[in-house]
Amino acid sequence: MSIIIKVHARQILDSRGNPTIEVDVVTENGVLGRAAVPSGASTGEHEAVELRDGGKAYLGKGVLNAVNNVNTVIAEELVGTSVFEQNTIDQLMIDLDGTPNKSKLGANAILGVSLAAAKAAANELGLPLYRYVGGVSANTLPVPMMNIINGGSHSDAPIAFQEFMIFPVKATSFTHAMQMGTEIFHSLKKVLHDRGLSTAVGDEGGFAPNLAGGTEDALDTIKLAVEKAGYTFGDEIMIALDCAASEFYVDGKYDYTKFEGETGKIRTSAEQADYLAELAAKYPIISIEDGMYEDDWDGWKALTEKIGNKVQLVGDDLFVTNVARLSTGIEKGIANSILVKVNQIGTLTETIAAVNMAKNAGYTSVMSHRSGETEDNTIADLAVALNCGQIKTGSASRSDRMAKYNQLLRIEEELGSTAYFPGLNAFKIK
């Protein structure tokens, strides 16, 4: 047993220049575990609460209150606890907070400690984090969803959908998948440049061009980039969308004018489901995330019945990595996949519970970053530890995104012949 002797938090800056929290957990043997917490731009209403300071400093986005909660309340409780008792550590913090959404201490404070403790425990044993958390069965490298065109709340592009992603499903390994995705990313840059469009990137490293033709223009442009890179669109490369529909759901309608101006349409729930089905029929779209508003259960049901047998329907804002929300979705037969964001729920233990529930119900799991990231690469290890089979962590640019991809390259090398890359098998459409 190795005892925690120190828990210390500090305020650092994320990839958008906003404050976030970083936590150190130190054991009696002098072993350190360190974790930095990400932050989202488009957040679900049902997510655990990220504690911000308000006031003038950092435009109200400081996290010194969360830092103080770690350094006083949480530290006092955890010092003297075994670093290997992850469930106990997480439950102690949940009990200390005492709210259903972690609004007292802050999910950012609690998560930082939870992940730092797991890292310290892994380091104590001389194990990589993926092996400590996942045990001997942790060997699946995820297929990367590479976000190459940003829209919605992640850019200034006049497109409602937040992410247009490529899936290198015919890659033979994670290393090969990264090569394919990166080549297409550079090909897309040239395609956009030749059209006189901006090649500036959004929060997650994808391009944010002013595509006058909206969604279909983005998809057609990606198709051209894929082909110019020497790959087959619809075979070697498939498409995934993150609609982030909650971001443009207004007064019971899906209001595309919020991002697309006067060219955008306003759709009912039924029309939204029909529109997504039409896109999936026209383009090789294998996955759609948050195609409906997070509380539009009827809309989600209609969408699932319409295309859920052939398209992965991922719940992000819908499920917020929460077993209660996920359980409801499973009972209602809604969606068939869960997006996994550790900061939506706030502890490693609860994250693992959500992934296990999804697997037991036949739902797929997609490990995910947030738009506000740091150099912390914990989610790369967790994707392998939990055998998610898929990961969303941005484009082939920005060091905060590449940190995760590079860690996965290292893990694949370390696993050697035992590494498994699922390709199309990552998608178990019911």
From Swiss-Prot:
Keywords: Cytoplasm, Glycolysis, Lyase, Magnesium, Metal-binding, Secreted. InterPro entries: Enolase (IPR000941), Enolase-like_C_sf (IPR036849), Enolase-like_N (IPR029017), Enolase_C (IPR020810), Enolase_CS (IPR020809), Enolase_N (IPR020811). PROSITE patterns: ENOLASE. GO terms for cellular component: cell surface; extracellular region; phosphopyruvate hydratase complex. GO terms for biological process: glycolytic process. Disulfide bonds: none annotated. It comes from the Bacteria. Its cofactor is Mg(2+). Its EC number is 4.2.1.11. Binds a second Mg(2+) ion via substrate during catalysis. (2R)-2-phosphoglycerate binds at residues 162, 341, 370-371, 392. Mg(2+) binds at residues 242, 289, 316. GO terms for molecular function: magnesium ion binding; phosphopyruvate hydratase activity. CDD domains: enolase. It is found in: Cytoplasm; Secreted; Cell surface. The active site is at residues 204, 341. Pathway: Carbohydrate degradation; glycolysis; pyruvate from D-glyceraldehyde 3-phosphate: step 4/5. Pfam families: Enolase_C, Enolase_N. It catalyses: (2R)-2-phosphoglycerate = phosphoenolpyruvate + H2O. Catalyzes the reversible conversion of 2-phosphoglycerate (2-PG) into phosphoenolpyruvate (PEP). It is essential for the degradation of carbohydrates via glycolysis. Belongs to the enolase family. This is Enolase.
